[in-house]
A protein has these predicted regions:
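C-terminus-biased signal that marks the final domain/tail of proteins
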Residues: 1-239
Length: 239
């Protein structure tokens, strides 16, 4: 294998999309997604916050080959609402979108945060968990008896709304209009709240030290927020 060190990158960051940059040319997958990622990261340039990564590359429907972003299409242009979901960064097979947020030199590694959106990224919002908390994570992110975690299960339910065709090549057809109109706004709103609350707690850890009791209280509130989100979104499933 070949190790790439981000310190050697003139841009100060690296991004990869499945295929081997150092391997045999034109083998592997993800070349078109790489072009999409290139556009997104170069336009942003710096200050890649967890929120930006989760809400931009992870949910982007910019096509690296066709140079077209679905968000720029009007409802009328979308017609019946369906698009062919091929070579976008979020794929039908996507199972999660996660961001590891480390600490600065001299800071406590226990404050390292995993922002975890489990399930199809456009239908799931991120909830933070802390390294220092060990196995203490929100119940909505936990699974029992090999069942799906509640957050994952609900993301799968929402995914079923935007990929409603189950026969033949149905999983290639995304109801983008429904996703954009009925689901993404609620996902982004829920995630913005979660990130704001998580960042506030993390800042207190930096100044006051890691506190497991604060994490437990945060987790309980995160579970309540998830339950409220799930209840609110039930009307989408009942249409």
């Amino acid at each position: 294998y070949f190790r790439f060190d981000v310190k050697d990158s003139p841009k100060g960051y690296l991004y990869r999309t499945n295929f081997s940059v150092a391997g045999v040319e034109d083998q592997g997958a993800g070349y078109i997604r790489y072009e999409a990622a290139t556009k997104l990261f170069e336009e942003k340039g710096s200050e890649f916050t967890p929120g930006w990564i989760l809400d931009n590359p992870a949910r982007s429907f910019y096509h690296g080959l066709m140079k077209r972003d679905l968000k720029d299409l009007s409802d009328r242009q979308l017609g019946e609402g369906y698009v062919i979901s091929q070579d976008y960064i979020p794929r039908y097979t996507t199972v999660s979108s996660i961001v590891f947020e480390g600490v600065n030199p001299g800071e406590d590694p226990a404050n390292t945060v995993l922002w975890s959106a489990i399930g199809y990224a456009p239908c799931s919002y991120a909830i933070p968990v802390w390294v220092g908390a060990g196995d203490e994570i929100p119940a909505c992110l936990s699974s029992k008896d090999k069942a799906l975690a509640p957050a994952n299960e609900f993301a799968m339910d929402l995914k079923g709304i935007v990929f409603p065709i189950t026969r033949g090549n149905g999983n290639k057809y995304l109801d983008y209009l429904t996703l954009r109109r009925d689901i993404l706004p609620a996902i982004v709103k829920a995630e913005d709240k979660e990130i704001a609350e998580g960042e506030k707690l993390n800042k207190s850890f930096i100044t006051e030290g890691f506190n497991i009791e604060k994490v437990r209280k945060f987790n309980a509130k995160a579970d309540k927020r998830f339950e409220a989100f799930r209840e609110k979104m039930q009307k989408i499933l009942e249409k």
